[in-house]
Every structure is written in structure tokens, then in C-alpha cells.
Amino acid sequence: MSTKTQTTTTHYAIQKKRRAEFIEEWRNYRQTVIRQEDVRLEPTARGLRTGVYMGWDGDRPTRCLDALVHEVDPGTTSTMHRHSWDAILFMLDGSGWTEVDGVRYDWKTWDAIHIPAWSWHRHGNDGDKPGRFMSYSSEPMLWTLGMSLIEDAGHAPFATLPPRPAFSGGIPGNDPYSRRLRRLAQETKKRRSGRIHTPYDEQEILATPRGTRTKFLNDRAIGNEASGLTQVMIQFAPGKTQSLHRHPGEAWLYVVEGYGHSFMGHSPDQGEHHRWKKGDLIVVDHFLWHQHFNDDPVNQCRLVRIHMFDSILETMRTLMDPMVLFEEAEDTLVSMQELSQIEWPDDKRPGE
């Protein structure tokens, strides 16, 4: 017997109330700087120690991407698992290896790795000190769509595990279904053939008009085929800053070296200053003007910037046009002549 829901409230009233409650809830989740000392690492069933900077599982919910830190002890091999989302890793300290679909990638400090969706992967450490790395994933985005799935296979060898989900190949024809099959097959093949490992020394760091030097760690420009996740190393010369700009969230900046502060405000001249140091995570989680400063007059500082602009922001820009979603204060940009006068520290990993 079928039933019919009875309500005397209009859909307009229901949605208006729900939307008001939703935005108020998320305003209460907003963050600025997550301190390293506030992130507690705990042993996990995978054999790692893990802490959450940003994400549902650390009681700091997000919409697009998360930020976690992991440690793998000497002689340890984690369990093998896979998930419906992708992730990027940044290696903070020590050395180790990550196996992706049966291929081992040895890494050391400041290397980066992309973990494609549905790829079996695990981590290990053959060294004599713990390896430490950050992970940033698109899981929150998949969660909003009801498509977050994870599968842990324990210590089963890769050769015994099922492959990534199968897909139908393209077929001839110009009808909508044939065209969809070909389009999706082509995209899937491309996504499954991207770069996995980026050794830090492989890319050159270059000066930009924003007043800093940068290099890609993960990005489609260097061959990664991610969900839009990108990762860039930003080097600040002593006492220098980056140009003032704004864009929608979410974007994280992990403090790799040094100390400084960030301005964040709803207008270029009205906001607050937030101090940070090595190991902290700077959070830009909504549409704010922001600018980052190296407060050390003698030494460089380094931030690693992470966001999903290639997918989330580009979609938002398309849907919101002609509203401008990425702006820079042009009077804070640096000329090429000014850039040439900056004395940049060498671009070397720790210990080199």
C-alpha cells in the first residue's frame, strides 16, 4: 500500500529555512590557522599514525578537500586500500615508499605523489627514522555527492586484488549513447595514465609577479591527472610578501619553513592578521581577500599551497560569470625589475 506524505508547508518555505540553517552551520565551521600542536596523531588500523588538520574525521568539516598528516615508522608497511576519491601527498620529513597499483615509488623530503581514484596503495619505510607526510584528498567533495567509498584489503598482495572498476570502450555511431561511451572511455584512459611521483628537484622554481618563487608539485601542467587537486611550493625571500588577492575557498597553505602572518578580510583594507609558524596550516575557506607575509628579516619561509581550482573553481567561474571570482590587487604585484633585485636563497631540500 502506497503512502503519501502530507505537509501544509510550501517547498519555498522549507528550502528557505533549510538554506539559511545550512549557511549558518558552515559559518560556524570556519577556521583561519590550524596549529601543529593542536593536531594529535593517533595509531590507526592501517599501521600509521594519523592526525587531521582539516576534515570531518577531525571535527573540522570541509566541502572540497581535507588535510591530514601521517607518520610511518621504520620497518612498517601499512595495509593496502583504495577509495573512490584521489589524493595528493607532500613528504615532510624522512624517507619511505608508496606503492600504487603494484608499482613502488621511493620518496624523500619535499617529494610529491598523486594517488589516483580507485588505485590500490600502501606506504612503507625501510629507513631508520619515521617518515612523515601530508595528504590532501577530494573525499569531502565526493561525500557531498554521496559517492565516498573506501575498501581496505589488509596485507593482501596487489596481484590478488581486483583491478580498478571496468569501463565500456567506445563504439561507432553518432547517437548520444555512442558519443557518451567514447567520451567517457577516452577520459578514463587519460585519467589513469597521469604522473604519480614528482621528485622535488625535477622542477625549477621561478619568480612570479606576485613577489614569490614557485614550482608545481602536483598539477596537470606537469602531467598529473587529478580531480583538480594541485600543489605548489611557494618560496618567500627574507622579509618579503605575496600579492593581495581573493578567491573562493577552499585553499590550504602548509607552512614548510619559517614564520610569518596572513591578512584576511572582506575588503582589501579591512581584516585581521593571523600569525603562523612551521607546521601550521593556513586556511582560506571562503571568499576573502588575503595576503601572506614572511616576518623573518634574515631567512626565507616556504608555504605549500593546495586547492581544487582546476575543477571546483573553474566550474564556479563558469556558472557565476560575469561575476569575477579571482581578483588581485594590482598595486601589490611586483615588477620584473623589482623581482630581479631580490636575493633569493638557494632552492634546496633540508639536509642538502
Predicted feature residues:
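Conserved metal-binding segment of the jelly-roll/cupin
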Residues: 73-75, 100, 107-127, 133-139, ...
